[in-house]
């Protein structure tokens, strides 16, 4: 992987990630394909929304279908017929989400399979081996996602163990002679000094990119912004910056303003299946009866297949009848909305018009532009 940085405006960055399987323009949003599929979508449909890269889930793909079946197909690209870049998370967040059915030790994590209750052990070495079998273009280190809330002492112990796991991930990745990219994950909760210690340790180990983890786990939005403002300028400028698990459209805008290059989130797909649709004028809840006879598209400014061909009334009808097509059309729209937002942000950074773009974005939502510190380095 090669990262090229073209231009900046304030802390916002315009660049690209270059892989053997294709180029990813940044800032980029990655749709989530947890089980090797973006729910309800063919790879061709996902690509048509403008997506250059997908996120796959190491933990779930390890449990089903497993490494053996994956290797029989070649790798995850062949298994799901997506021949463009794939980033896989390490499984750390999914283990964190298991709660009481897992036990974390220095060696790794003991847990029971959420599928059949089988006892399973996952550690940094195994995570690297699984991601190697998946053929991931970007491999994430195995870490512990610091919960929120956590005391500073709890966050410190978690972060320091994640650093030790980062070294083990690096060592196993190198032993496997994996030719792809390996990203470190910055932890430390909402504590700036711990984030500093985490980043310093990761840079000393050396990675191809750096993710900001442990956010979007329940902390107040001002805390997320504060950590981004503190951490982003300290990440080596020649490495991509990835904010994990974020988020709403406004979170992407605010992340880009603070220097983030990559995002992922289940929100556009999950919300689509629940009838919550993102538009340039805010969220439309298609289940609302006001849309029953509305012949307008979801968003006049959207060029997606759904908006070009179907009315709000039709989408309301599909939802009321619980038709699968409704969820598919909604997903196409939401994913295209997110990609159009990223395209707009990239173009605005290129032309030095980011402030105007951000102002127009919030005006469309009927909101004031949030104040941010003078974000210059």
Swiss-Prot record:
Its cofactor is Zn(2+). InterPro entries: ArchSynthase1/Queuine_TRR (IPR050076), TGT (IPR004803), TGT-like_sf (IPR036511), tRNA_ribo_trans-like (IPR002616). GO terms for biological process: queuosine biosynthetic process; tRNA wobble guanine modification; tRNA-guanine transglycosylation. Substrate binds at residues 89-93, 143, 187, 214. HAMAP family: Q_tRNA_Tgt. Homodimer. Within each dimer, one monomer is responsible for RNA recognition and catalysis, while the other monomer binds to the replacement base PreQ1. This is Queuine tRNA-ribosyltransferase. It comes from Shewanella denitrificans (strain OS217 / ATCC BAA-1090 / DSM 15013).
């Amino acid at each position: 992987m090669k990262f090229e940085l073209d231009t900046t405006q304030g802390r916002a960055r315009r660049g690209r990630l270059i892989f053997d399987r294709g180029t990813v323009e940044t800032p980029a949003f990655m749709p989530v394909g947890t089980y090797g599929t973006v729910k309800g979508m063919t790879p061709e449909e996902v690509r048509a929304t403008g997506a250059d890269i997908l996120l796959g889930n190491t933990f779930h793909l390890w449990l089903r279908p497993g490494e053996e079946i994956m290797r029989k197909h070649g790798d995850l690209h062949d298994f799901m017929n997506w021949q463009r870049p794939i980033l896989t998370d390490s499984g750390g967040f999914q283990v964190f989400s298991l709660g009481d059915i897992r036990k974390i030790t220095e060696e790794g994590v003991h847990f029971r399979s959420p599928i059949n209750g089988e006892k399973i052990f996952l550690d940094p070495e195994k995570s690297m081996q699984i991601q190697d079998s998946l053929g991931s273009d970007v491999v994430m280190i195995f870490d512990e996602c610091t919960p929120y809330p956590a005391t500073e002492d709890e966050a410190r112990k978690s972060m320091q163990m994640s650093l030790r796991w980062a070294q083990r991930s690096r060592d196993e990745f190198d032993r496997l002679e994996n030719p792809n990219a390996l990203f470190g994950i910055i932890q430390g909760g909402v504590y700036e000094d711990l984030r500093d210690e985490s980043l310093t340790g990761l840079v000393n180990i050396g990675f191809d990119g750096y993710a900001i983890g442990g956010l979007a786990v329940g902390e107040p939005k001002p805390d997320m912004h504060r950590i981004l403002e503190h951490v982003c300028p300290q990440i080596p400028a020649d490495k991509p910056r990835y904010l994990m698990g974020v988020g709403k459209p406004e979170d992407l805008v605010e992340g880009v303003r603070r220097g983030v290059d990559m995002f992922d989130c289940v929100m556009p797909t999950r919300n689509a299946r629940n009838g919550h649709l993102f538009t340039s004028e805010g969220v439309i809840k298609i289940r609302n009866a006001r849309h029953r006879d509305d012949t307008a598209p979801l968003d006049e400014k959207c060029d997606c297949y759904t908006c070009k061909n179907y009315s709000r009334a039709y989408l309301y009808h599909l939802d009321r009848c619980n038709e699968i097509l409704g969820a598919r059309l909604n997903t196409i729209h939401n994913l295209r909305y997110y990609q159009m937002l990223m395209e707009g942000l990239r173009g605005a950074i290129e032309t030095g018009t980011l402030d105007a773009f951000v102002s127009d974005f919030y005006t469309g939502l009927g909101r004031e532009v949030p104040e941010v510190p003078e974000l210059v380095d």
